[in-house]
A protein has these predicted regions:
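Noncatalytic alpha-helical scaffold of FAD-dependent oxidoreductases
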Residues: 1-275
């Protein structure tokens, strides 16, 4: 009875709850995350220690593999469950956690090959802050700042530029993976190609990702946007198809759907000047 009344009050007065409790807590949480990111990017960053960090992961996995199979616990990363972009919350506290959350550095940018080399826990926000001042962005850049590039590569990611370049994992040039026996392999389309093609959608079940190379694209200072209303599902679908499949397709295609027969389609093109 009391529980039903409590949730009924929360529902009826949700604006007050959100404004009085949700917003302050969200602001504090966001501030803490930003300070944490600033610390990791400006103070704790040590890309030159990548090899040592990978060796540490290999050592931990090798020791796990040496335990008799009947006594082994399931293996997982030490990334906090609450940080996952998932509806599943696994009981990691009962599993064998591999310490690898320090793998969060941007390692290098190869401008000639248009590839950036990163560690798996680099976030979308972090890599964007690194690339934009240099005139580049990831070929597939999500709007979720705290999403990690490793998670997107091993699961799935797409964005408003995907009609040109495909899904996130289709823009991965190489994976560095520690296998269950502790060995380190580099998977590309030419080397360990079976593993390269199996890693997307695997959610970390085939090995621990310790590094990857991602395709980048050059950017311009501005994006010229065009907004087109649609007044039916057919019009909306046809217009989206036309834009995405055109020979001179815009760089970005997105839409906001307001109802069954009302939507606004947004298309954007890189521009050198503000228009």
């Amino acid at each position: 009875m009391f529980k039903d009344l409590f949730f009924d009050l929360l529902t009826k007065h949700r604006t007050l709850v959100l404004a009085g409790i949700g917003l302050p807590i969200g602001t504090i949480f966001d501030t803490v995350l930003r300070l944490r990111n600033l610390y990791y990017e400006r103070i704790a960053s040590a890309p030159q220690e990548h090899a040592q960090r990978v060796a540490s992961v290999q050592d931990q996995v090798t020791r796990w593999a040496s335990v008799p199979e009947a006594e082994r616990k399931p293996m997982c990363t030490d990334r906090k469950t609450w940080m996952n972009l998932s509806t599943r919350f696994e009981p990691k506290h009962t599993w064998h956690r591999i310490k690898m959350s320090g793998l969060r550095d941007v390692l290098s940018l190869d401008i000639e090959q248009q590839v950036v080399h990163v560690e798996p826990f680099v976030t979308v926000g972090q890599i964007t802050r690194y690339l934009l001042p240099r005139g580049y962005m990831l070929a597939v850049t999500l709007e979720i700042e705290e999403a990690t590039v490793g998670g997107l590569a091993m699961a799935v990611g797409m964005t408003t530029h995907s009609h040109k370049v495909g899904l996130f994992q289709e823009n991965v040039k190489a994976y560095e993976v520690v296998l269950a026996d502790g060995s380190l392999v580099r998977a590309t389309t030419e080397e360990h190609s079976d593993l390269f093609h199996a890693l997307p959608w695997s959610h970390g079940t085939l090995g621990l990702l310790v590094g990857l190379s991602l395709r980048v694209i050059p950017v311009k200072p501005y994006v010229h946007m065009t907004y087109s209303p649609a007044y039916s599902q057919q019009e909306y679908c046809e217009r989206i198809r036309e834009l995405a499949c055109a020979a001179d397709a815009p760089d970005f295609v997105e839409a906001t759907v307001y109802s069954k027969d009302r939507a606004v389609i947004m298309s954007g093109r890189f521009a050198d000047v503000e228009t």
